[in-house]
Amino acid sequence: MKKVLNFHFSYIYTYFITITTNYKYGDTEKIFRKFRSYIYNHDKNSHVFSIKETTKNSNGLHYHILVFTNKKLDYSRVHKHMPSHSDIRIELVPKSISDIKNVYKYMLKTKKDIKMS
């Protein structure tokens, strides 16, 4: 958590992103790799922290991603570079300790309070 907190306050923007796909048309892992490549081309100094999750209900695979960057993401440009069947949700995380802790906690799917050290 300490590293995530450091990145959150060291970079201008922190985005919480979820990537899912319709398996009929695409591979979530390929889309994640393409997205990660897009982010690093967008800002070479950015940092990506991701968690891959498989849901048992629908046998679906999706990614929860934190992107730390000094350049603002243009949502429409991101979507333009991704396949049309991919579902990418992008949210800006406010610059507060409680907000980043809640996002991180959600990503880890834990009910426990997260320590800062």
Swiss-Prot record:
Keyword Transport assigned to the entry: answer is no
Q: Which InterPro entries match?
A: ORF117-like_Rudivir, ORF2/G2P_dom
What Pfam family is a match for this entry?
A: REP_ORF2-G2P
Q: In which domain of life is the source organism classified? A: Viruses
The compartments listed are:
Host membrane
Keyword Membrane included in the entry's annotation = yes
Keywords in alphabetical order, please.
Host membrane, Membrane, Transmembrane, Transmembrane helix
List the transmembrane segments. 4-26
Q: What is this protein called?
A: Uncharacterized protein 117
Q: Which organism is it from?
A: Sulfolobus islandicus rod-shaped virus 1
